[in-house]
Amino acid sequence: LEYSKEKKHGSDDLLGQENRLDWLTPLCLLGLSILSILFIQSAQAYTGGDQWKMQLIWCVLGFGAYLLFSWIDYHLWMRYAHFLYIIAILALLLVFGGPVLYGASRWIDFGIFKIQPSEIAKWTTMIMGASILARSKVGGMQDSLSGIAKVGLCFSLPMFLIFLQPDLGSTLVFPPIAFSLLYVARIPTRFFIATFVVFVVLIGVLGWDVFRYYQYKSENPRTSEATIAYEETSLVPLKDYQRKRILTFIAPEVEDPHGIGANWNRIQALIAVATGGITGKGLGNGMQAKLGYLPTAVAHNDFIFAVLAEESGLWGSLLAMLAYGLIIFGCLKVAAKSSDRFGAMIAVGVSVLLMTHLFVNVGMTIGITPITGLPLPFLSYGGSFLVTCFMMLGVVQSVYRYRKEFR
């Protein structure tokens, strides 16, 4: 990326300069928020759920956060990055004393609402990593290795704590963000080549473990005792349900040949997308969620795209993808116009986070990625992730607004 070398030329009237504001992103956010409320209500119409009302509240709070953070000079986050990072780590530690839902400790319960610190940690870790690299001298091998080591340590701690919850999906969001920051910081290419080699090796180890898991399951009774025995001998620290999801994705006919177990949600999501056709069945007329084939526990969050695709069809799905594309393109445009490396890293990091969630969530809905618990930005139900996404894009707007304030 080439950063503009603009200097400050006196104080600017921010209210009077339209070129300091990106109006397209908030319009896209408004459209996605409306779709979110409509399809969450539709997904729960049969059971009478009222999560759409909470989603409406979260959207209003999110837009408030977007406006607030867009007016705050983004350089402030660089100053307080360490403080925010420490708070996020402490919050991740607190979840282990909180409620256990769906077999995981991921939330801090405040009574009237819960927050998921892992979503906030994605943002604070990104800020911390960008702050480290912005203050570091990179280019030479020794300086670059120092920056890589600091960023690696910065990202490893929250990844480890989130993995223990367990939440493998959120854990895997961190590496793409880290690599995007390092790329913008212009770390030497040979580092990325070495990392790719390590990645291939890790994928090979994971594949070997899943193959061993399949063989073990074939030769031993499918009991909890057998599962525990395998986990104790495995070198890969995955839970049984995580291995099942991977095996279901690779060989569904092996793990769940009848499609009534681990492969159920995937099959029902594919049916929803396929039967939506070009124009969809109409709002509230989708059968998969309404009749319970797509379980109510996941239809309004992890599989909200399946509901959207069934009821609005290909055109509605493409419209949502267009909105995401414009938001992500807007982030990359801001990065290119940024006056400093810190602002560019924030904008690129946010775009990569959104792309990762988008690819994994939509991918699992249409059967090209394994099922994980990653929500779809601005569409899936949930407060922590939704408000955090609004905050992040607000900061990206701040980078665009204050791009001439670089000293």
Map each language-model feature to its residues.
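N-terminal membrane topogenic signal
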Residues: 13-29
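Re-entrant/interfacial helical elements at transmembrane boundaries that shape
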Residues: 173-174, 285-292, 323, 365-373, ...
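Residues that form generic nucleotide/phosphate-binding pockets
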Residues: 17, 249, 272
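A juxtamembrane structural motif centered on a specific transmembrane helix
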Residues: 1-14, 40, 338, 356-407
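Long extracytoplasmic/lumenal interhelical loops at the membrane interface
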Residues: 260-261, 267-315, 342
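Hydrophobic alpha-helical transmembrane segments of multi-pass inner membrane proteins, especially
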Residues: 26-42, 46-265, 306-366, 391, ...
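N-terminal low-complexity, intrinsically disordered patches enriched in charged
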Residues: 45, 71, 178, 285, ...
